[in-house]
């Protein structure tokens, strides 16, 4: 979630290149309208720092926007903050956000140009583990130029999960396209979750197949889809498009019926995220 003043040009260009269904329109009103249209009860709204060396004023503006947008909607919108790990104020800022409004942290290693397993991030992870709050990571590749993939490869998350087993880790985009690697992470670590936003193929004829391949790999290796969460990456990918992709997958049982049940896929769409939110009190806050 971002104000129009803080949307960088490269994200505007990416949204325009995707055509219908992709937008930079943001804010609580548009998100709640989408949720109502899709039958979604609650959503996470994240602050996004899109550059490696932002000025303090920009970081404050990005977080303040999300804080103000989710205010008054705590039953439906949970705000995740963002920090600049290169700033000497990062840990203090993080504690302040968690103490006053944020339910979690968003870290985008590709845009912030820092490997997710960097020692510079460990003081931040220590705070998140102490609070028991989730970190939502960008994981896997990124289709947005000029950002680079190397900071968020799937294998980098193993060390974090080993060193911070009490910190809930949500791997945004499910380490796209490293399905076997993310399946291995979910097999090994109980605190790791895979989120399915933008797991949508570009070939319309096989659009749902990547999601099917991901879910089959996780079921075969981790034994369950319970740690697979619904997410959309709205407004760049709409909530409706993500729901429709799951519906397409359900309509193609040949892709999954030897391994999965329809109920397991429906749980990814309808119930797993709610169970995660309840377990971590995302929408019951005293802030």
Where do the PLM segments sit?
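Mid-to-C-terminal alpha-helical segments outside catalytic/metal-binding sites
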Residues: 1-42, 223-227, 238-287
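Generic structural signal for well-ordered alpha-helices
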Residues: 28-32, 63-70, 94-95, 121, ...
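Catalytic pocket-lining loop regions of alpha/beta-barrel enzymes
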Residues: 103-104, 117-229, 257
